[in-house]
Amino acid sequence: MPAKKRKGDAISGIGSMSSRKMKRKKPINSDLMVDIKPLTDNQQKFFDEYKAGKNLFAYGAAGTGKTFIALYLALKEVLDQITPYEKVYVVRSLVATREIGFLPGDHEDKSSLYQIPYKNMVKYMFEMADDNEFEMLYGALKAQETIRFWSTSFLRGTTMDNCIIIVDEMQNLNFHELDSIITRVGENCKIIFCGDAAQSDLVTVSYTHLRAHETLRYLV
């Protein structure tokens, strides 16, 4: 995991921005986020390519910080007052429960179990006095839809605009799911794919499935 540093007394000075630059009010002050630095050359490359404004394909073994860095950089940019991005969408396939529609509850109830790792990541990104303060902050992020979680089973009819999309565990996506995600991308969007073929939960991996992933790596 990348290293994080405490911020000093430096404040970004939101009040000094002109109203012309402040496109909208963000629900959380980005100054609450800790300063996280890359620990490896590959992590540094991830930071650099992201800052260059590119769509990314983060491919690597477990524990290399793919999803953490993607979520950190995305949240930091979304909470910046002058960027066009308003939301972070975390999209993944719930392979073991791909028939998730048969489970009781709404989409939030069905996907809540899979949100726990991301909540833990977000906790590491903010400097809060105690757990209660973090719960309030995280609740605000969710309530304002600054961060949203989607299963590929519920993307139909959705258009994602002004957002940063993180497609996590993408090695578990079939061709139909990949197509569903890409065709839902709207205006002012950035997309990051994170995955590792060695961690695939698919029962069978077809030649077509592998070719789709290889093609995607060259497209982003």
Language-model region placement:
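Interdomain "pre-motor" coupling segment immediately N-terminal to P-loop NTPase/helicase cores
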Residues: 1-23
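Pre-Walker A adenine-sensing motif
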Residues: 40-51
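Hydrophobic anchor at the beta1->P-loop junction of P-loop NTPases
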Residues: 58
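Conserved lysine of the Walker
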Residues: 66-67
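Walker A/P-loop NTP-binding motif
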Residues: 71-80
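Inter-Walker segment of RecA-like/P-loop motor cores
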Residues: 105-154
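Conserved RecA-like ASCE ATPase "motif II neighborhood" in helicase/translocase motors
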Residues: 145-164, 174-178
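Conserved small/polar residues in nucleotide/adenosyl-binding loops
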Residues: 208-215
